[in-house]
Structures are given as structure tokens and as C-alpha cells.
């Protein structure tokens, strides 16, 4: 347990229990793990911050219906994709800089299909994210869900999705929960690697994000996935 905590201090007792069961062959009751953690002074380093919704575009060119309708599951990979953009900050001396992360999440295996980082939150950011996803999955024609951010409501973006054989879906006004799973991913990433830390360069912040997404896809166990990683579930589904 000490080794797990030293390697990943963000893990709470539930995730420590999952690690013990999966990788050490030691199935232990969660309450017992909690008691031992308390006796050893093991506590998750996760920090929390307030959450908010993306503001809707002021002059949208295209507003599709909420086709997804909170049906946050899929029978196979590349059936339903969610996307969103989130903001990070880093500091160079007393100057605050912003960095934006755009990502696409698959609802079957919860893997991050693609992501992009830019200094500006613009249409180029979401186009790059989509282009990467299409390049990696050329035969994918998923339902594509987002909030009403200005980048997703342009006619150009809608036409891009249509050309790729995708159906566009969009959250209702002010309903963050309509895009809940990817909002949840932002929370996981920031709690485990961002909150409580001060990044002093763009390179340092970008490196953290890239490394975390690789860790999330290939190494981070999820109970909703049967204590498997997203890429393990993806491989299992494709082999079925």
C-alpha cells in the first residue's frame, strides 16, 4: 500500500484496493484498506475546484437537437463520441498564461480518442482534435456530441461532421450534465494532476497533460469498466 501511494499519491483507498486486487492478487475489503490507510497516514493528494458550464455561442449558425439525450453508454467503440474544451493556466514570473485542451471521449470504453493543445480557444483547436480522431479511426461514423460552445455551432464544423458520416448532437442550454462523462474526465485529470500544483512553463504543463492522457488510457483502472483500463476494454470489444 505504501508503494502504491508513493507511486501515485493521488489514489484514495478505493483505487488502492483496486490496485491490490488487480495487480497484486490480494483481494481486500475496502473498509480494511481504509483503516490501514488511516493508520499509515496515507491520504489522497487530490484537490478540488469549482466547476462551471461553457457559455453558449451568442450567434450560432447551426444548433442540432440533443440526440444523445444522456444515453451515456455504447455497445461498441466509435459508436458515440463526446467532445469538449477545458482551460489550464501556467505562470512565467508574475505573468499568467492560458492553455486550452480539446479532447474526444468514446462512450463505450471511455478512452480518449484524440486531443489537441493550443494557446487559444478557437475553431482550429476543435478541428485539429476531430482531424486526429478521423485519422486514427477512418471508418468511424459515431454520434458526435458537444455542448453549445461557439466552435461547435458553426456551419463549417457541422459540414465537416456530415462529410465524415457523423450525426451531430448538442447539449441543451446550461445543462452541463448533458455532456457529463467528458466533464467528468476534466475533473479527474485536474484533481489528480493539476489542482494544488503551480506550472511554470508551457512545456511543463503540456508534458503533464500528454503523460496523464496516456496513463488514463493505458494504466488507470476504472470500476465502471470492471476494474480495467479504457484500452483494455477497447481491445476486448474489438476482439469480440
Question: Which ranges hold each PLM region?
Answer:
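Active-site beta-loop-alpha junctions of metal-dependent nucleic acid enzymes
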Residues: 97, 115-137
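Mobile genetic element proteins and their domesticated derivatives, centered on retroelements
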Residues: 1, 16, 33, 37, ...
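C-terminal domain-tail junction helix/linker
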Residues: 162-166, 188-240
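An active-site-proximal beta-strand-loop segment
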Residues: 70-113
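Hydrophobic (often cysteine-bearing) scaffold residues that line and stabilize catalytic clefts
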Residues: 9-13, 29, 60, 64, ...
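RNase H-like two-metal-ion nuclease catalytic core shared by retroviral integrases
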Residues: 54-59, 146-148, 154-157, 168-190, ...
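Basic, flexible linker segments flanking DNA-binding modules
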Residues: 1-76, 175, 229-238
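Short small-residue beta-strand/loop micro-motif enriched in glycine and branched aliphatics
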Residues: 109-115, 168-171, 195-196
Amino acid at each position: 500500500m505504501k508503494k502504491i501511494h508513493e507511486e501515485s499519491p493521488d489514489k484514495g483507498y478505493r483505487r488502492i484496493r483496486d490496485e491490490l486486487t488487480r495487480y497484486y492478487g490480494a483481494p481486500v475489503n475496502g473498509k480494511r484498506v481504509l483503516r490501514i490507510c488511516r493508520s499509515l497516514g496515507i491520504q489522497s493528494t487530490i484537490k478540488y475546484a469549482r466547476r462551471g458550464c461553457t457559455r453558449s455561442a451568442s450567434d450560432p449558425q447551426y444548433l442540432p437537437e440533443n440526440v444523445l439525450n444522456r444515453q451515456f453508454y455504447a455497445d461498441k467503440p466509435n459508436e458515440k463520441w463526446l467532445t469538449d474544451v477545458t482551460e489550464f493556466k501556467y505562470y512565467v514570473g508574475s505573468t499568467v498564461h492560458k492553455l486550452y485542451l480539446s479532447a474526444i471521449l468514446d462512450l463505450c470504453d471511455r478512452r480518449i480518442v484524440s486531443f489537441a493543445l493550443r494557446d487559444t480557444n478557437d475553431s482550429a483547436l476543435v478541428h485539429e482534435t476531430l482531424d486526429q480522431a478521423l485519422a486514427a479511426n477512418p471508418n468511424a461514423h459515431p454520434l458526435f456530441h458537444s455542448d453549445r460552445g461557439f466552435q461547435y455551432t458553426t456551419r463549417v464544423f457541422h459540414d465537416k461532421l456530415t462529410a465524415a458520416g457523423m450525426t451531430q448532437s448538442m447539449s441543451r442550454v446550461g445543462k452541463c450534465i448533458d455532456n457529463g462523462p467528458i466533464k467528468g474526465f476534466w475533473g479527474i485529470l485536474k484533481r489528480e494532476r493539476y489542482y494544488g500544483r503551480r506550472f511554470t512553463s508551457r512545456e511543463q504543463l503540456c508534458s503533464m497533460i500528454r503523460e496523464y492522457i496516456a496513463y488514463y488510457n493505458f494504466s488507470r483502472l476504472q470500476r465502471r469498466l470492471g476494474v480495467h483500463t479504457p484500452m483494455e476494454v477497447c481491445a476486448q470489444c474489438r476482439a469480440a
